Amino acid sequence: MSWRLSETKKAEAKRPAWRLSDAKYRVSKLVATLGRRRLGRVKLGRLKPFVGLITVFALACVFSPARRGEIIFLDFGNLTDILRQVSEKGIIAVGMTFVILAGGIDLSVGSTLAFAATLSSVMLMRGGYGTPETVVTVLAAGLLVGAINAAVITKGRIQSFIVTLAMMSAARGMARLVSGGSGVEIGYGDGGAPQSFASVGAKVGALAPVPALIFLATVAMAWVVLNKTRFGRYVHAVGSNETASRLSGVSVDWVKFGAFSICSLLAALAGIIHCAQLEQGNPNDGVAYELDAIAAVVIGGTPLSGGVGTVIGTLAGTLIIGIINNILGLNNVDANVQLLLKGVIIVGAVLLQRK
């Protein structure tokens, strides 16, 4: 008996000071193992987005119109167009993944894109700035938008839905202020934007578009952050149980600050790509982009309640939406019907997650 007591005392002596509180220690262990338990619970669920992607791809091949006996959908040019078209919304969806995983929502990403695209065009055409200065300034502006969102949410204790809804209006208002209320065309060549800015929306030779490569690089970096860093583990933990995370010593406010800042930063990056591809920035751009981003995240297996999900699933969700939009366009389906189908798909994805 004395031997057991001495061993217990030795174990307590070795235990760090912050573990001396048994309640706090148990909570800390809970947060530390959230990721491992989550893997065991949702390993099968993670496959659903990819099963859906394969299914949608197969259906697209079946329902695609043909030209000269060849399936138009499988044409290399069409597939690269899909990648190019989903890049902007996909980048936004990656940022939205951080926010939703942390238990929040960001409705201002579409307006942030419009603000970033408009600011880019104004700096290039009216300010005479070069590509590096423009890109850095616009990304900093996007980061500031996210910081404001996070500060009001965490310090004011206001729901993210309300705060970002207000920022949705404010960011679009800022876009109108910097542009004078109208779109600004940039163009390239004499008197236009630098050719280096055009490369942001161009292709690498005859292969993949640069926006698609940026999108895939963003997914890769987000995967590393969410799966290989302490911040990523904290994002999952806060979304799973904010109270337990706070009790264990996690700085919940800073985690949310990081998530919302990353989201707005990526929305600004998407705005730069948007401006480079369309050769203009317009305060009215990006309408309903937040819905597409949320749809991609949810279809990718991340519930709106947060805590569980992967950025790879978001990639799959983005491609699913892109393929559906493409095949509907190839079949000349009315745009209003496309919106209706998108809503049905989102509801279906949520129902599948609950089973």
Give the predicted meaning of each segment.
Residues 129-138, 144-149, 153, 205-281:
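Helix-loop-helix "hairpin" substructures at the membrane interface of multi-pass membrane proteins
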Residues 1-51, 352-355:
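Transmembrane alpha-helical segments of polytopic membrane transport and secretion proteins
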Residues 38-44, 102-105, 124-126, 144-188, ...:
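Short loop segments and helix-boundary regions at transmembrane helix junctions
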Residues 49-62, 96, 169-173, 214-223, ...:
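Hydrophobic core segments of alpha-helical transmembrane domains in multi-pass membrane transport
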Residues 160-229, 257-258, 278-283:
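Transmembrane helix-bundle core of multi-pass membrane transporters
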Residues 261, 267, 277-343:
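Transmembrane alpha-helical segments in multi-pass inner-membrane proteins
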Residues 25-93, 128-133:
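Membrane-interfacial amphipathic/re-entrant helices at transmembrane-helix boundaries
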